[in-house]
Amino acid sequence: MNVKDAIEKVAAEYPLHPAIKIPQRYGLNNVHYKTISFEALRDCVGKLSTYLFGQGIAHGDKVLVMVPPGEDLLVLIFSLLNIEAIPTIIDPGMGVRNFLNCAKKTQPKVLVGCPKVRYLLPFLSLSVRTLRKKIILTRSLKKQLETKGFVCNLQKHCNLDSPAAIVFTSGSTGYPKGALYTYRQLNAQVEALQKAFNFQPDEVDLPLLPIFSLFNPILKMTTVVPEMDPSHPSTLNPAYIVEAIHRCHVTNIFGSPRLWTYIADYCESKQIMLPSLKRAFLAGAPVHPLLLKRVQDLLPSGEVYTPYGATEALPVACISAKEVMEETYAQTLQGGGTCVGFPLSNVRIRIIPITELPLTTLPDPLPVHSVGEIIVQASYVSEVYINDLPAIKKAKIVADGIVWHRMGDLGYLDEKGRLWFCGRKAECVVANSGKIYYTECCEAIFNACPEVFRSALISYRQGSTTSPAIVIEPKIMPMRGKDKKILLEHIQQWSKQCMLTCDIEKFFLHKNFPVDVRHNAKIHRLKLARYFQKL
């Protein structure tokens, strides 16, 4: 199904089927769900499409999208696709400076936002010289669209290789980059998701990462808007999420490991199960096998999965909690990395020698079990970044007219063809001795220590000497200096049990690790390294 025509076709097939359920809370224990059918969603998209077209927004115009998740986001995105304008999606939690830099790089012609973004308009006008029009979706404008009966009668260009959307990366180990997707790539992405997970038209999805809600209308699924602030996911109230799962009979849910930790803690404390869930996806950062098991125990009729991918390439691989616990967990505990499963159908994965240099030819693959750089190729992998030639040269390899994407990750393939993740390339530590330390492999050793909540491998420099160091976030931070010293000595002794970590000599404690805003789970190891380098 073409993403452009999806709403129209789904509305014709399932006109009264709920497309969106929006929570409206009245007090702590009283929530009502406003329901919008696919037929109503189609009408909203048609009216807004016609209005935007009448405002001069046309084929190929880049449009900066600044609306909250839910009804407004879905209607706006599909309206822009309908007139073949290019929605530009930037993470609202990355901070004003990063946001403005992303907007400036994109060079959008139009901004469409909610009333709350008015405070940013002066900054945007100064930073983004290409902006010619700013449209605020006020209540009065929405009312006007409802009552005036706009009719959408737009010419369809139907060029599948035209730009369809720009989605920015989180920039957790660099700077945010705008991945450009064509209609052909978006269509292929939807087909890959459907083939891998067999979503059914009567299913209900609760996406804790807003961008994933955009696939639901195309997959004929109902979207339940979560009660949370997407720019501050750590403020999530797990009680509200569990209530939504039960009230709306949610069958599908996506969330980061940190958010799932909140949900699992809540469910276990209240002895609550989640029987309606068929699938729970944990992604956005490496997932501890014990968390996978905890979530699986909450789903008597469902499966827990951890997919692997990136903003530029999703999905790449996937593994179930059951396979992790039965086949790969023991190797992870021994420092073997995290298994992220078999590549999805029609996805090619290759492990190549590690290098920081741009590549103009496709390197030969490394042998099985050899750690190297992960590169991937699929019909839905984004091939370019918007207005960023240096990033394109660094992240893309063109071979025989086919574009491979360098994931920026390190890992290896095992004898069965499964992919194992060993960490980000930018975060591995190369010691003066030449030995390479991988974050995912080393941290697994320390994360098994009873006193440790999580750990981070960082590069520590003293003069011309580079060595690995481990930062520990304890479950309970000792208050007294004496107790901190005892804990660090215990951690140092713990490191001696494994060949991977026995020669690490620097250890630090940190109360709260800095993490990314999008998933609230990816550790900012480079930021930690800068912090301890200054001490």
Regions found by a protein language model. Give the residues of each.
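Conserved pre-ATP/AMP-binding loop-to-beta segment of ANL
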Residues: 15-18, 149-171, 175, 198-204
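Conserved AMP-binding/adenylate-forming core of the ANL superfamily
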Residues: 20-70, 74-78, 95-100, 157, ...
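Conserved AMP-binding A3 loop
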Residues: 35-39, 164-191, 222
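Structural core segment of the AMP-binding/adenylate-forming
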Residues: 82-145, 474-480, 493
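Conserved AMP-binding/adenylation subdomain of ANL enzymes
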Residues: 86, 187-204, 209-252, 266
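Gly/Ser/Thr-rich phosphate-binding loop
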Residues: 221, 252-254, 265-335, 348
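Conserved C-terminal "lid"/linker of ANL adenylate-forming enzymes
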Residues: 456-461, 469-470, 492-535
